[in-house]
């Protein structure tokens, strides 16, 4: 838990002194409270987000699907037969494409899905100061769809790109950026507003075939993060 308080002076414009406490250390800075739609608590995180934004114009909140990516509620179940495969909260089964009215453009593509709920106790750190963010991360093949239990992060023409995105979402870098906006257990496209879009083709400046730890280090270098910022993540 914790306590956050402020004094509001309604007729004053300008910067506000902000003091944060992390692991017994206090940091102070002058902040513009209206600079962003969301207020980032830790000053270290502000610097990281600023570096990411200075190197990217497009973020994953423009790619992640809305709730109900295929228009199917959580309680929808597979049919006895169908030309599609439906992923729902208890597994997979047949479904008919004639019943799909939303997300048709994604059906034939390779899709990466996540649960619309974060991992248990999201927002709370463990003894090492780490947070669990994504509770489910799967790939749907062409002709596979899902209920609103899941969000489609992105859809691709090739399996190579989908696998690269899957690796990207496993990095500490991405999960840290999601955590800054994931204050509740519900995930939505808005929570990906700090996650920079990447090139997942073979022409990418990141080698997605490497280990997750190595991909993390490539991303840290790409966005010019310092040793202290990497340690904070």
Stretches found by the model and what they are:
Residues 2-149, 154-206, 210-227:
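C-terminal substrate-recognition regions of SAM-dependent nucleic acid methyltransferases
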Residues 228-233:
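Short, amphipathic C-terminal "tail helix"
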């Amino acid at each position: 838990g914790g306590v956050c308080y402020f004094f509001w002076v309604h007729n004053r414009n300008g910067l506000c002194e902000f003091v944060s406490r992390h692991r017994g250390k206090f940091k102070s800075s002058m902040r513009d409270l209206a600079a962003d739609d969301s207020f980032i608590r830790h000053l270290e995180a502000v610097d990281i987000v600023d570096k990411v934004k200075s190197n990217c114009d497009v973020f994953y909140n423009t790619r992640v699907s809305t709730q109900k990516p295929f228009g199917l509620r959580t309680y929808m179940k597979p049919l006895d037969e169908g030309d599609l495969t439906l992923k729902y909260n208890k597994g997979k089964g047949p479904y008919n494409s004639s019943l799909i009215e939303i997300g048709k453009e994604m059906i034939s593509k390779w899709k990466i899905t996540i649960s619309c709920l974060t991992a248990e106790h999201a927002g709370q750190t463990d003894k090492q100061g780490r947070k669990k963010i994504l509770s489910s991360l799967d790939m749907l093949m062409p002709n596979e769809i899902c209920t609103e239990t899941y969000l489609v992060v992105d859809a691709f023409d090739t399996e190579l790109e989908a696998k690269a995105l899957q690796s990207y979402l496993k990095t500490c870098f991405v999960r840290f950026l999601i955590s800054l906006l994931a204050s509740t257990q519900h995930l939505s496209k808005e929570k990906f507003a700090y996650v920079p879009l990447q090139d997942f083709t073979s022409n990418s400046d990141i080698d997605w075939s490497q280990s997750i730890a190595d991909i993390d280090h490539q991303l840290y270098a790409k966005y010019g993060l310092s040793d202290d910022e990497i340690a904070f993540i």
